[in-house]
Amino acid sequence: MTRNLISFIYALLLSLPLTSCNANGAGSETPVISDNGENTPLINETRPIPDGYGQDANEQGSIVRIDYDTRDYAEGTGMARTNTAYVYLPYGYDAQKQYNILYFVHGHYSTAASTFEDEDGAVCKLLDQMIAHGDIDPMIVVTPSYNYGQPTSNYADADPYCRALPQELVNDLIPIVESRYHTYAKTTDTEGIEASRDHRAIGGFSMGAVTTWYAFDETLNAFRYFMPVSGDCWSLGRFAGMNRPDDTAAYLAERVQQSPYAGNGFYIWAASGTNDSAYSEILLQIEGMARLADVFNATNMTFHQKEGARHEFRPIPEYLYNALPFFFPKSNE
């Protein structure tokens, strides 16, 4: 089956009525066709976290605070400033080994520390348990912040700060973290970061998802995997992914086609809960992108939903439990 025929079938299927699962449990999945000829759903239900993964593991990773120098990328002054990020290091971190790495951005009214603190440290416990059970290789997780001091009073007003964070990551935080800790980056200049992008992911919740879409738009050369949770792309304006899904899809498709990463050079693992206030925001955009099947299809984009989940931190560990083994499958070593 040729790629053109695959794309045609994919687009034809997406033109059919789509019913997503809702709080009442009714729904269906729209099938799409992958390059290998297998049926792959665009919309997927998340798998629940196994019992016991919310408990402290015998072997626990550590959290390190990093205060680093950066500058104003958002307000246009270019003035020097400092920011803070937190780094999860797996138990037994070995400076001689290479580690995959995820940068995960908090939602509004939260901080860089929130991801590792909320729900009694649920994300830390999850990472420890996933590593202990062999679901993933030991990996590093970094939680940065887009806040310049206190969060803006209106979450939507954080837009310019969310847009600025990917540049801050690439220019300032990634070089610090990945020169201090051993990832797959042989160097932390632009060339070294791009050469190691297959082992780097970025994700975020709510306004962190908006940040993730900006990273896809503006720093595709630095990350291969993208995990926007409950937030749409604002590159064409606030809530444009929801309100202008086809325009947003066309814009992002052009950005991909201008890069060397079209096809399988990236993966978007989007997610939300069926009772999440931002569910339609991100799903409408994903459906718009899926209509451009020559650029966005099951080989590089899927949507994952948790039945009944709301717009809160509580389901984040389940999204991570489902996404991380996909980004970074367990090695045979």
Description of each model-found segment:
Residues 27-333:
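Non-catalytic cap/lid and distal C-terminal segments of serine-dependent acyl enzymes
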Residues 13-15:
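Secretory targeting and sorting signals
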Residues 22-24:
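Bacterial signal peptide processing site
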Residues 18-20:
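C-terminal motif of bacterial Sec signal peptides marking the signal peptidase cleavage site
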